[in-house]
């Protein structure tokens, strides 16, 4: 099994809350559209600190191959294109368990 964790930090603008809610909503749609996803959890951070990220995705996949299939899936690519205008930093961790 593969665990895929992604943390996003969004630019501090007047639109930040709206953007985070839109990101969360769009992320939550992906499991119904991408069959490679086994487990999927999205959360908004409530801890305010300079080092904190705004939103986290924790997901599981059967293998490195299915994670790669997810990465290039048209619905995932569409999400990446959707968030490109307002994300400023992304951190990713993938590991086997």
Question: What spans do the regions from the language model cover?
Answer:
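Short S/T/G/P-rich N-terminal loop/turn motif that feeds into the first structured element of a domain
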Residues: 1-54, 62-69, 95-97
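An amphipathic, aromatic/His-enriched active-site/gating alpha helix that lines ligand/cofactor pockets
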Residues: 17, 60, 64-93
